[in-house]
Regions:
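Low-complexity, acidic/polar, glycine-enriched regions of mature
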Residues: 2-239
Length: 239
């Protein structure tokens, strides 16, 4: 084999190592997706007393207006399965934005109403920058449609009035606007009132095709499922 032939072989081997290493690196980075949104553990009475919180500091009921806090603990995101080249099982891609605002009202101790949540989709990030760019430029086209909104279609009546520190569940109907398209969605929410805060978590099953979203393939991703989930954890503080 001449010098030119050897150089070609070396070049092919190097290219294979680079590409193979890239696939392995991508696969290793996507092997551990963050878990779905879940309620934080209920604060203990002892912890509240240690922090100087007393019954006089906290309202007796959660009634009133609440707003999403701005300390970065709230997020709205997505979960979707993507198939990577040369891997047998799909990877669950997860992206989140902590740029979330919104308000809700609690009335009569057991009714949630006037909910409106907005998320800045240009701030969505995952463990892969190429995925994030594909979502911004194609997919969600968040440069063109930067905001997602969720509103209640009607008030949610809880089965029981919330007790401080205890988990409650609520079901209802909302209106989700993504990619310039608004559709009704079924809501199955879990929440916990912890005196000065209320945390609400949930997942909304959606189909990208319902919102005219083209799955944004990139790099080693050969296919993306149409079904996805809007995943969120919202921490509210009293206004």
């Amino acid at each position: 084999m001449g010098r030119t032939g050897r150089l070609v072989v070396v070049g092919v081997v190097v290219l294979a190592l680079v590409l193979g290493g890239g696939y392995l690196l991508f696969a290793s980075r996507t092997s551990d997706s963050p878990p779905p949104a879940a309620l934080d553990p209920a604060p203990s009475t002892t912890a509240g007393q240690a922090a100087g919180t007393t019954g006089a500091d906290i309202a007796a009921t959660p009634d009133g207006t609440w707003q999403v806090n701005d300390d970065g603990s709230s997020y709205v995101g997505y979960r979707v399965k993507e198939q990577l080249a040369f891997l047998d099982s799909p990877n669950e891609a997860v992206g989140r934005s902590t740029a979330v605002t919104g308000t809700m009202e609690v009335a009569g101790g057991d009714t949630v109403e006037n909910v409106r949540i907005e998320a800045d989709l240009t701030r969505l990030t995952s463990d892969e920058s190429r995925r994030d760019n594909a979502i911004r430029l194609r997919g969600l086209e968040s440069q063109r449609y930067p905001t997602a909104t969720l509103e209640l279609a009607e008030p949610i009546r809880l089965a029981t009035a919330p007790m401080e520190g205890q988990e409650v569940r609520g079901q209802g109907t909302g209106r989700l606007t993504v990619h310039g398209v608004t559709r009704e969605v079924a809501l199955d929410l879990r929440g916990r009132w912890s005196g000065s805060t209320i945390q609400v978590v949930g997942q909304l099953p959606v189909k990208m095709s319902d919102y005219q979203i083209q799955p944004p393939r990139f790099g080693p991703v050969v296919s993306i499922e149409d079904g996805a989930a809007v995943d969120f954890s919202l921490v509210f503080e009293r206004v």
